[in-house]
Amino acid sequence: MTPNPTPTQPSRRIAHLDMDAFYASVKLLRYPQLKGLPVVIGGSRRKMDEALQAREAGRDTADIPVDEFPRLRDYVGRGVITTATYPARQFGVGSAMGLMKAAKLCPQAILLPVDFDEVRRFSQQFKQIVTDIAPVMENRGIDEVYIDFTDVPGGQRESGLSLARLIQSSITQATGLTCSIGVAPNKLLAKMASEFKKPNGISIVQPEDLQSRIWPLPCRKINGICLLYTSPSPRDVEESRMPSSA
Protein backbone atom coordinates (compact mmCIF):
# COMPACT_ATOMS: atom_id res chain seq x y z
CA MET A 1 0.00 0.00 0.00
CA THR A 2 1.13 3.51 -0.74
CA PRO A 3 1.38 5.48 2.51
CA ASN A 4 -0.85 8.50 2.83
CA PRO A 5 1.06 11.72 2.16
CA THR A 6 1.90 13.80 5.21
CA PRO A 7 -0.26 16.92 5.29
CA THR A 8 1.68 20.07 4.59
CA GLN A 9 1.87 22.34 7.60
CA PRO A 10 0.83 25.93 6.87
CA SER A 11 3.60 28.49 6.91
CA ARG A 12 3.63 30.59 10.05
CA ARG A 13 2.30 34.05 9.24
CA ILE A 14 2.41 36.70 11.96
CA ALA A 15 1.18 40.25 11.40
CA HIS A 16 2.05 43.41 13.29
CA LEU A 17 -0.56 46.15 12.99
CA ASP A 18 0.34 49.69 13.97
CA MET A 19 -2.16 52.53 13.81
CA ASP A 20 -0.74 55.52 11.94
CA ALA A 21 0.04 58.52 14.19
CA PHE A 22 -2.83 57.27 16.31
CA TYR A 23 -3.27 60.07 18.86
CA ALA A 24 -2.97 62.73 16.17
CA SER A 25 -5.23 60.89 13.74
CA VAL A 26 -7.97 60.64 16.37
CA LYS A 27 -7.75 64.42 16.83
CA LEU A 28 -8.00 65.01 13.08
CA LEU A 29 -11.33 63.20 13.04
CA ARG A 30 -12.57 66.03 15.27
CA TYR A 31 -10.73 68.72 13.31
CA PRO A 32 -10.61 67.56 9.66
CA GLN A 33 -9.54 71.04 8.55
CA LEU A 34 -6.08 70.26 10.01
CA LYS A 35 -5.45 67.32 7.69
CA GLY A 36 -2.18 67.73 5.81
CA LEU A 37 -0.83 70.27 8.32
CA PRO A 38 1.93 69.81 10.91
CA VAL A 39 0.11 68.94 14.15
CA VAL A 40 1.74 67.98 17.45
CA ILE A 41 -0.08 66.18 20.27
CA GLY A 42 1.29 66.37 23.79
CA GLY A 43 1.71 68.15 27.07
CA SER A 44 -0.94 68.70 29.72
CA ARG A 45 -4.04 70.78 29.16
CA ARG A 46 -3.25 74.50 28.90
CA LYS A 47 -5.16 77.79 28.99
CA MET A 48 -4.95 77.98 25.20
CA ASP A 49 -6.68 74.58 24.99
CA GLU A 50 -9.46 75.80 27.25
CA ALA A 51 -9.86 78.85 25.02
CA LEU A 52 -10.19 76.60 21.96
CA GLN A 53 -12.76 74.48 23.77
CA ALA A 54 -14.75 77.61 24.61
CA ARG A 55 -14.77 78.61 20.93
CA GLU A 56 -16.22 75.20 20.05
CA ALA A 57 -19.40 75.87 22.02
CA GLY A 58 -22.41 75.89 19.73
CA ARG A 59 -20.46 75.37 16.50
CA ASP A 60 -19.23 72.52 14.35
CA THR A 61 -15.60 71.82 15.25
CA ALA A 62 -14.84 71.37 11.54
CA ASP A 63 -15.76 75.03 10.98
CA ILE A 64 -13.14 76.49 13.34
CA PRO A 65 -10.62 78.47 11.24
CA VAL A 66 -7.11 77.06 11.23
CA ASP A 67 -5.65 80.32 12.48
CA GLU A 68 -7.62 79.98 15.73
CA PHE A 69 -5.72 76.87 16.82
CA PRO A 70 -2.83 77.08 19.32
CA ARG A 71 0.67 77.10 17.81
CA LEU A 72 3.72 75.27 19.04
CA ARG A 73 5.79 78.47 19.02
CA ASP A 74 3.66 79.85 21.87
CA TYR A 75 4.27 76.89 24.19
CA VAL A 76 6.28 77.34 27.38
CA GLY A 77 6.91 74.38 29.69
CA ARG A 78 8.51 70.98 30.05
CA GLY A 79 5.96 68.83 28.25
CA VAL A 80 6.88 66.21 25.67
CA ILE A 81 5.34 65.10 22.40
CA THR A 82 3.02 62.10 22.46
CA THR A 83 2.88 61.92 18.68
CA ALA A 84 2.95 64.13 15.60
CA THR A 85 1.36 64.03 12.19
CA TYR A 86 3.53 62.97 9.26
CA PRO A 87 3.80 66.55 7.92
CA ALA A 88 5.23 67.57 11.32
CA ARG A 89 7.68 64.67 11.28
CA GLN A 90 9.18 66.02 8.09
CA PHE A 91 10.64 68.84 10.21
CA GLY A 92 12.36 66.36 12.55
CA VAL A 93 9.63 66.44 15.19
CA GLY A 94 8.87 63.12 16.86
CA SER A 95 7.47 61.24 19.83
CA ALA A 96 9.09 61.80 23.26
CA MET A 97 10.77 65.02 22.08
CA GLY A 98 10.46 68.04 24.36
CA LEU A 99 7.87 70.52 23.13
CA MET A 100 10.27 73.44 23.52
CA LYS A 101 12.83 71.70 21.30
CA ALA A 102 10.12 70.83 18.78
CA ALA A 103 9.06 74.49 18.71
CA LYS A 104 12.48 75.40 17.34
CA LEU A 105 12.14 72.84 14.55
CA CYS A 106 8.54 73.51 13.58
CA PRO A 107 7.19 76.65 15.30
CA GLN A 108 4.19 76.84 12.98
CA ALA A 109 2.89 73.41 14.06
CA ILE A 110 -0.52 73.29 15.71
CA LEU A 111 -0.36 72.04 19.30
CA LEU A 112 -3.24 70.04 20.79
CA PRO A 113 -3.65 67.99 23.98
CA VAL A 114 -4.30 64.25 24.07
CA ASP A 115 -7.95 63.21 24.20
CA PHE A 116 -7.51 60.01 26.22
CA ASP A 117 -11.19 59.07 26.27
CA GLU A 118 -11.46 59.19 22.48
CA VAL A 119 -8.15 57.40 22.02
CA ARG A 120 -9.26 54.55 24.29
CA ARG A 121 -12.59 54.30 22.49
CA PHE A 122 -11.00 54.02 19.05
CA SER A 123 -8.41 51.59 20.41
CA GLN A 124 -11.13 49.24 21.62
CA GLN A 125 -12.98 49.62 18.33
CA PHE A 126 -10.10 48.74 16.01
CA LYS A 127 -9.09 45.77 18.18
CA GLN A 128 -12.63 44.42 18.08
CA ILE A 129 -12.55 44.64 14.29
CA VAL A 130 -9.28 42.69 14.25
CA THR A 131 -10.53 39.87 16.48
CA ASP A 132 -13.77 39.60 14.52
CA ILE A 133 -11.63 38.69 11.49
CA ALA A 134 -8.60 36.98 13.08
CA PRO A 135 -9.31 35.85 16.67
CA VAL A 136 -5.72 35.16 17.80
CA MET A 137 -4.46 38.64 18.70
CA GLU A 138 -1.80 39.86 21.14
CA ASN A 139 -2.38 43.31 22.56
CA ARG A 140 0.89 45.31 22.55
CA GLY A 141 -0.34 48.77 23.40
CA ILE A 142 -3.10 51.23 22.78
CA ASP A 143 -2.24 51.50 19.07
CA GLU A 144 -0.57 48.22 18.07
CA VAL A 145 -1.25 44.49 18.07
CA TYR A 146 0.20 41.24 16.80
CA ILE A 147 -2.12 38.92 14.88
CA ASP A 148 -1.63 35.24 14.04
CA PHE A 149 -2.71 34.74 10.43
CA THR A 150 -1.45 31.14 10.23
CA ASP A 151 -4.74 29.24 10.55
CA VAL A 152 -7.18 32.01 9.69
CA PRO A 153 -9.17 31.40 6.48
CA GLY A 154 -7.35 33.36 3.79
CA GLY A 155 -4.34 33.92 6.03
CA GLN A 156 -2.01 32.05 3.67
CA ARG A 157 -3.32 33.64 0.49
CA GLU A 158 -0.65 35.85 -1.09
CA SER A 159 1.43 35.16 2.04
CA GLY A 160 -1.07 37.05 4.17
CA LEU A 161 -1.54 40.07 1.90
CA SER A 162 -5.23 39.41 1.24
CA LEU A 163 -6.11 39.13 4.92
CA ALA A 164 -4.03 42.20 5.78
CA ARG A 165 -5.93 44.19 3.14
CA LEU A 166 -9.25 43.03 4.57
CA ILE A 167 -8.31 44.07 8.12
CA GLN A 168 -6.85 47.39 6.97
CA SER A 169 -9.87 48.35 4.87
CA SER A 170 -12.32 47.22 7.58
CA ILE A 171 -10.64 49.47 10.16
CA THR A 172 -10.60 52.47 7.84
CA GLN A 173 -14.21 51.99 6.80
CA ALA A 174 -15.42 51.73 10.41
CA THR A 175 -13.24 54.39 12.05
CA GLY A 176 -11.85 56.72 9.40
CA LEU A 177 -8.34 55.86 10.65
CA THR A 178 -5.48 54.20 8.80
CA CYS A 179 -3.00 51.58 9.90
CA SER A 180 0.14 49.91 8.60
CA ILE A 181 0.64 46.15 8.66
CA GLY A 182 3.71 43.96 8.36
CA VAL A 183 3.40 40.20 7.78
CA ALA A 184 6.34 37.85 8.33
CA PRO A 185 7.27 34.43 9.79
CA ASN A 186 7.70 35.87 13.30
CA LYS A 187 6.88 38.87 15.49
CA LEU A 188 10.29 40.51 15.25
CA LEU A 189 10.24 40.65 11.46
CA ALA A 190 6.55 41.56 11.35
CA LYS A 191 7.13 44.61 13.55
CA MET A 192 10.01 45.75 11.35
CA ALA A 193 7.93 45.19 8.22
CA SER A 194 5.06 47.33 9.50
CA GLU A 195 7.39 50.36 9.29
CA PHE A 196 8.38 49.82 5.66
CA LYS A 197 5.40 51.50 3.97
CA LYS A 198 3.97 53.89 6.56
CA PRO A 199 1.42 55.35 6.51
CA ASN A 200 -1.43 53.10 5.36
CA GLY A 201 0.83 50.45 3.88
CA ILE A 202 1.23 46.68 3.91
CA SER A 203 4.58 44.88 3.68
CA ILE A 204 5.22 41.16 3.35
CA VAL A 205 8.58 39.71 4.42
CA GLN A 206 9.60 36.16 3.46
CA PRO A 207 12.57 34.20 4.87
CA GLU A 208 14.40 34.69 1.58
CA ASP A 209 14.04 38.48 1.96
CA LEU A 210 16.31 38.72 5.01
CA GLN A 211 19.54 39.49 3.16
CA SER A 212 18.05 42.08 0.82
CA ARG A 213 15.53 43.82 3.09
CA ILE A 214 16.56 43.26 6.71
CA TRP A 215 20.37 43.10 6.80
CA PRO A 216 20.87 46.61 5.35
CA LEU A 217 18.77 48.21 8.11
CA PRO A 218 20.45 50.03 11.03
CA CYS A 219 20.45 48.20 14.37
CA ARG A 220 18.01 50.69 15.88
CA LYS A 221 15.32 49.29 13.59
CA ILE A 222 15.46 45.98 15.46
CA ASN A 223 13.01 45.98 18.35
CA GLY A 224 14.86 45.54 21.66
CA ILE A 225 18.35 46.41 20.40
CA CYS A 226 20.11 49.05 22.50
CA LEU A 227 19.94 52.47 20.85
CA LEU A 228 23.57 53.12 21.82
CA TYR A 229 24.68 50.56 19.27
CA THR A 230 23.69 52.32 16.10
CA SER A 231 26.90 52.63 14.09
CA PRO A 232 28.61 49.24 13.66
CA SER A 233 31.90 49.15 11.84
CA PRO A 234 32.08 47.47 8.42
CA ARG A 235 33.96 44.60 10.09
CA ASP A 236 31.18 44.14 12.65
CA VAL A 237 28.65 43.97 9.84
CA GLU A 238 30.61 41.40 7.88
CA GLU A 239 31.24 39.24 10.95
CA SER A 240 27.57 39.32 11.86
CA ARG A 241 26.77 37.82 8.45
CA MET A 242 29.22 34.94 8.78
CA PRO A 243 27.67 31.54 9.55
CA SER A 244 28.23 30.26 13.07
CA SER A 245 30.79 27.49 13.51
CA ALA A 246 28.69 25.89 16.26
Q: Predicted segments — roles?
A:
Residues M1-I142, Y146:
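Residues that scaffold, gate, or flank divalent-cation-dependent active/transport sites
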Residues S159, L163-P218:
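Long, highly charged, low-complexity intrinsically disordered interaction regions
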Residues I142-T150, P185-A190:
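Short, conserved phosphate-binding/catalytic loop or strand-edge motifs used
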Residues Y229-P232, D236-A246:
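Single conserved hydrophobic/aromatic residue that forms the stacking wall/gate
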Residues C226:
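Short, conserved phosphate/pyrophosphate- and ester-handling motifs at nucleotide-, phospho-/glycolipid
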Residues I147-R165:
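Catalytic palm subdomain of template-directed nucleic-acid polymerases
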